[in-house]
Amino acid sequence: MKIEMKNISKSFGTNKVLEAIDLTINSGEVHALMGENGAGKSTLMNILTGLFPASGGEIEIDSEKKIFKNPQEAEGFGISFIHQEMNTWPDLTVLENLFLGREIKNKFGILDTKAMRKKANFAFEQLGVKIDLDKEIGNLSVGQQQMVEIAKSFLSDLKILIMDEPTAALTERETERLFSVIAGLKNQGVGIIYISHRMEEIFKITDCITVMRDGLVIDTQKTKETNVDELVRKMVGRSITDYYPPKNAEIREIVFEADHLSAEFFKDISFSVRSGEILGFAGLMGAGRTEVMRAIFGIDKLKSGTIKINGKSLTINNPAQAIKEGIGFLTEDRKDEGLVLDFSIKDNITLPSTKDFIHHGLFDDKTATTFVKQLSERLNVKATDEEQIVGSLSGGNQQKVVLAKWIGIAPKVLILDEPTRGVDVGAKREIYQLMNELAERGVPIIMISSDLPEILGVADRIAVMHEGEIAGILAKNEATQENVMQLATGGQ
């Protein structure tokens, strides 16, 4: 199958988001689609798969004009889109998820479970993976759930597969498994559109790259004919000389202390963070990093241990108490835990600090609006105004709104869990710069990251976790990818 998108444009009201886009996808090819968040990548793919119509231009499939009315019609034609937030039902089994809305029935109108099992097993065999069809999706790893989504696309004679940030939440082993599956699909003649910000992956598995910026296609070229610096320059319209901006914060007295913390998924965790310091937390998925931070913030219960801020012992049983004590927590899942997607930017940013805008029993909207405007400008949130619905923003701008929410409480300590996950290269640097500015103001920052180059480039010290314990804490001058991974995998 050959897809040609010709002169595609799209406007939402007066806002033009795509202009004169040309894109060609061939069978048996892995085609990277790159660009900053808000460049128009997802909009272009949503037009291709029929989620909404183009304002102009045309789509040809094997030289015939084609317009899909909805994603289901596109899937029936062999074009599947696996979104970053997967479309699965956690309480249903693998088999039920695979055939939801496409159940096979016998001539009596009764579900033909045997036929569905046979078809499901064949799909997984083609992928080279084994998954229990009777297991609930919610009990699978993210990598396994992704394989279910790919298997689902096999049920409709897959010809083109679109993947949006597919490795964002995968372990290293699951990522390698995915790359193996992609290679197999490519050999079977499936065309793959691969949306990612991860340069290493792009150069490892793709054949060609299309770069978008501000709703335009900047360039399309063979992967082997370009390099990281050139791609970054095309994506952001400028050269990023210091990918990790220099940090000038003075590291002073200890502000935050965790002493012998233990809970269900971790034990005997002790560490401290100083004023102006960025303490990184590294480790493999499942090591317990997020669980430690959730307990500190009062989401999960501690079994033992003490938490101190400025030498004062704290009792934190819920997030409201944590916020009252000056702890901010940007969670790893911004869409489910960090934001109310149907609320405005203003409503989201003021959520944890609403009481500060209550005067004589009434909400002071004017003061809140000024407050939000100042924060949005400081973080360079790209939006029409503070009333724009957060769900309509790009991933990078959504992340900035979550950051603004916690900066707005003037935190005594700020916890950031995967702060740049799913964020483009330009927005990443803005987040790093913001972290440096907060550190310069004396805010201690705890940052969890699964991106080793990032944590090495940003953190002053790195605590490495392995199987629920801190395996070691490394100073910046002794931290390398090799010794971090050695500690993370149980080495000494």
Swiss-Prot record:
Keywords: ATP-binding, Cell membrane, Membrane, Nucleotide-binding, Repeat, Sugar transport, Translocase, Transport. One of its GO terms (cellular component) is plasma membrane. Its EC number is 7.5.2.7. ATP binds at residues 35-42. It catalyses: D-ribose(out) + ATP + H2O = D-ribose(in) + ADP + phosphate + H(+). It is found in: Cell membrane. Residues 3-239, 249-492 form the ABC transporter domain. Gene3D superfamilies: P-loop containing nucleotide triphosphate hydrolases. GO terms for molecular function: ABC-type D-ribose transporter activity; ATP binding; ATP hydrolysis activity. It is a peripheral membrane protein. It comes from the Bacteria. Its main location: membrane. Part of the ABC transporter complex RbsABC involved in ribose import. Responsible for energy coupling to the transport system. Belongs to the ABC transporter superfamily. Ribose importer (TC 3.A.1.2.1) family. The complex is composed of an ATP-binding protein (RbsA), two transmembrane proteins (RbsC) and a solute-binding protein (RbsB). PANTHER family: CARBOHYDRATE TRANSPORT ATP-BINDING PROTEIN MG119-RELATED, D-ALLOSE IMPORT ATP-BINDING PROTEIN ALSA-RELATED. This is Ribose import ATP-binding protein RbsA. It comes from Lactococcus lactis subsp. lactis (strain IL1403).
